Amino acid sequence: MLKRQTEGSVICPACGVLVGVNDETCYNCGRRNPGLWGYAAALRRLGNDLGFVPLVMGGTITLYALSLLLSRGSIHGMLSPDSRVLLALGASGAFPVFEMGRWWTVLTAGWLHGSFLHVLFNVMLIRQLAPAVADLYGAGRMAIIYTIAGVTGFALSSAAGLYFPNIPIIPGAVFSVGASANIFGLLGALFHYGRRTGNSHAREAGLQYAIFLGLFGLIPGTGVDNWAHAGGFAGGLAASMLLDPLTRERTDHMIGALICLSLTVVALVASFVTALPYLIQ
């Protein structure tokens, strides 16, 4: 429970020193509102990611289960939901974005998955990478990077699906789901952190993961959306450059993260509501 604290001391989320819960600024680092309106201690108990990782993992698994439930008798091999159900819930790609005008699916597609192995693999990567990025950038900036990477990844994928649908090996996606664009954004953030700070471990980890997963996507028959991967990495890299990891996380980063999550929820609701006539048939 997020119980509000009205008196006493809390740990500044930016620099870690003890400050008053009602202090306007941290005396040590200058961060404004270090008590986060009395919720700093409660949020700290959620971990460095402030509960974002469990939220993404839980939401992703829940939506996968919902897609299987709505598929009813149309579940395919490897526990793959019906593509029409995924389309209704917010799949992205050239067809949903340009033919159907469902532009908001660049926010929602990263929460949907096409098979049990697909969701399992991506959830495991999120569990491994997102806390690491949160440790380096802070929870707010990590959530912003994750969201922006999904948007840029699926935007590029959809555009490539419209203009380059038949390129050998790396065709654009007419239809696409999965958190891999967001995951590549986290890799881009790790790479930038390593380059910005001189941390060779972070730089090499981000780059090597991206290269390995990128090469895997070039294997014929895997159905991997390489354009989403490239767009996600570029988006995560660009966002992390703007959200300089050498600066302390600020309150406006947390506000930005809440806006990103709110827009994603609105997009998911919009997808579901606009698809409701189909789903109740």
Segments predicted by a language model, with ranges:
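A detector for small-residue-rich transmembrane helices and their helix-helix packing motifs
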Residues: 8-21, 27-281
